[in-house]
Amino acid sequence: MALGVHLAAGEGKRMGQPKALVRDPDGTSWLLRAAAALDQGGCERVVVVLGAGADEAEAMLASVPVDVIVAPNWKAGMSASLRAGLGFLADGDCAVVSLVDLPDVTGEVVRRLIESGTGRDVLARASYDGVAGHPVLLGRHHWPGVLAGATGDRGARDYLATHDHVLVECGDLATGVDVDSLA
């Protein structure tokens, strides 16, 4: 069973607002779109990890079938959010970890990643025209190692750099561009 972990706790200093509260010019919420992508992509359960702007973001998610948690030490960076999200999940063989600041990642990307393989040993990530990106698919057996190496804003990056994993090409579906500024 693949679960979804959506990391949306960032303060968004370069954005000028918490990333969980960012909207496209047409009003589309990045938070809601990303949570929907995990659901539509085949995750059986989705947990959204909040931090900055948590009260407003949680209200936006009130009608969405997701679990919402607030990372207690979200200011420590992505690693704190990842730790909170994976720690919340008691079941499931693997988790698709997605970030709020990837506005063009769709359910099709998530589905393709899940279709590449699931299970407790899976380790895969989306790539865009050969460049590794997000989301990342982490089998449960990898969670302790990922969390042991996660510090500050470095989530699974160091673990993935030292462990064989599958790159799942998704460049035909999205760019995977991480948007840190609206300028």
Segments predicted by a language model, with ranges:
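Phosphate- and divalent-cation-binding pockets in alpha/beta enzyme and binding domains
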Residues: 56-59, 145, 178
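A short acidic, helix-capping loop that chelates divalent metal ions and anchors anionic groups
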Residues: 13-17, 145-146, 176
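Conserved alpha/beta core of the MobA/IspD/sugar-nucleotide pyrophosphorylase nucleotidyltransferase superfamily
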Residues: 148-183
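Short, glycine/charged-rich beta-strand-loop motifs at protein surfaces that mediate ligand recognition
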Residues: 100, 143-150
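Conserved nucleotide-sugar donor-binding
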Residues: 131-145, 182
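Internal, well-ordered alpha-helical segments in soluble enzyme and binding-protein domains
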Residues: 109, 134, 142, 152-156, ...
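A residue-level structural signature of the nucleotidyltransferase/glycosyltransferase Rossmann-like core
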Residues: 102, 134-137, 176-177
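Nucleotide and nucleotide-moiety/phosphate-recognizing core
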Residues: 1-132, 164-170
